[in-house]
Amino acid sequence: MERNAERTKGNILAAAVREFAQNGFSGARVDCIADAAGCNKGMIYQYYGSKEKLYENVIAYEYKLLSSIEAELISRQFTDPAELIDAIVDRYFDFLIRNPEFVKIIMWENLNEAKAVKSNESFAAVKAPIIDCIRQTVRRGREVGVFNEAANSKVVVFALITGAFSYFSNRYTLPCLLNIDLDRQDFLTAHKEIVKSGIRCYLKK
């Protein structure tokens, strides 16, 4: 019975990810989530309490996926501080390529002025591990004389995230306006190098 309950919760969450990614919080329908999950609406409210709480669980799930990538990077030992920066850029891009729903959900939440994120205190700590890792990396870079003293760790994290995220959040409009193909590997590689070199330039002593 417990196994079935966990399976149902998982099916609901997966269906909710797709529905909220496609329609945002306001446009998403619990009926559609229930149909896609193969359950009734009552089970959604039983397991998640409300549409709002289900939406928060979806955001938490998406952030947890990214956090697992960050945790793997944090666990690795980089002898060169700049190598970590390059590795994070590469993994962020890889993650966003594989998880288009993440981009859509975060875009919707930004349009919603981060109401769900602000209402749940647990989200405040979601970036703490990677910020601390970058802070230590910047400090180590200063100690060996390759990073400047004024470098701000949060600025670096912001640049890492937005440098990758903007590539995918603009993937429909900018290709039309600039006549470019964002799926071309050479274009993707060039953009990643711009992000990496820009952050390295900011950090350079």
Predicted regions: what they are:
Residues 91-94, 98, 128-144, 159-205:
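C-terminal peripheral helix-coil segments that are non-catalytic and often amphipathic
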